[in-house]
């Protein structure tokens, strides 16, 4: 809790992989996930994801609901704020002389919630999404049908 999880290495820019047993979970509370391309975090098992801020996740997943993998998950996802940032990836381009030049490629971010199947059960409430990049914190209460993807079971 109360941590900054950011700037994952660019060839594997991930915020975290959290897997627990359904009988013994983890709480992710009041964290700032910033500049990670994906897995902010990717979760399976029993977890609470409450009062976090997720900024600039690029074209990976802001919150990955266990992907399409098997296994039971029960989650509480409550009062988080997802803010779209400039969104870019580093790309190494090999030059004619054999050196590698790093360039930036602009990307379109994914929807904040991705993955998830009927084995991923969630209580989901009070999450906000600010997608307009205007520099003002003025997001809207998230709507699953328009702001998210995946097919979890809602509790």
Can you say where each PLM-predicted feature lies in the sequence?
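Right-handed parallel beta-helix
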Residues: 1-39, 46-59, 73-86, 123-130
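Extracellular beta-strand/beta-solenoid scaffold signature
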Residues: 7-21, 35-39, 58-68, 91-113
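Long, contiguous C-terminal flanking segments immediately downstream of a protein's structured core
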Residues: 78, 82-155
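Generic marker of residues within folded, mature protein domains
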Residues: 31, 67-70, 117
């Amino acid at each position: 809790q109360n941590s900054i999880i950011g700037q994952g290495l660019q060839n594997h820019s991930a915020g975290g992989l959290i897997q627990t047993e359904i009988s013994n979970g983890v709480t992710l509370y009041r964290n700032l996930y910033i500049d990670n391309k994906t897995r902010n975090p990717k979760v399976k098992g029993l977890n609470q994801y409450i009062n976090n801020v997720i900024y600039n996740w690029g074209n990976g997943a802001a919150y990955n609901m266990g992907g399409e993998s098997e296994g039971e998950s029960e989650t509480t996802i409550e009062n988080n704020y997802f803010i779209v940032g400039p969104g870019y990836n580093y790309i190494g381009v090999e030059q004619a002389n054999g050196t590698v030049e790093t360039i930036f490629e602009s990307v379109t971010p994914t929807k904040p919630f991705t993955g998830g199947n009927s084995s991923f059960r969630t209580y989901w409430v009070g999450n906000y999404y600010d997608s307009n990049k205007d520099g003002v914190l003025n997001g809207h209460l998230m709507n699953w049908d328009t702001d998210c993807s995946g097919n979890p079971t809602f509790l």
